[in-house]
Amino acid sequence: RLPYKLLTINCKLNLKLLIEFSPMEKKIFTTMAAALVSAAALAQAPAFPGAEGHGRYVTGGRGGRVVHVTNLNDSGTGSFREAVKSGKRIIVFDVAGVIALKSDLKIADNITILGQTAPSPGITLRYYTVQPGSNNIIRFLRIRRGQEKNINDGADATWQRNKTGIIFDHCSFSWSIDEVA
């Protein structure tokens, strides 16, 4: 003989609960439902406006620290290699030109690389393989492997084996011996 009320939550599922809530329970439930809906909406936000394909919901370094690449050195403070060593980061460029890699470049998980932030003519990575981590957003880079280093390792421009959640956007890959990307 309790008065029941019908509550409908519209998310991806239409969940209907037939429950009597006290005023405090209503506040708690409403707050928790709003948090869950917000989290679900954020998780489904595209990697960037117009992102399509399998990686369209990758989060990359979203919400992480913004790190500026301030030189074209292969390593050290301000270098691209230093910037991608650990995640959760968003990488932006204050410089443009060619970064002559001296070894394979391993990108940590949970990284967003915004190559479009570089001045003209943009950023080119040369000589060695780029190895993205999982949950990476990589935009507006040129990757040019080449044979100059005389290394017979298959010479892929990128290598993503056993990684998940990677999206490349407006990137170009060339001068590889085996697969390009």
Q: Which sequence ranges carry the predicted segments?
A:
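Active-site cradle of extracellular carbohydrate-active enzymes
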Residues: 171-172, 177-181
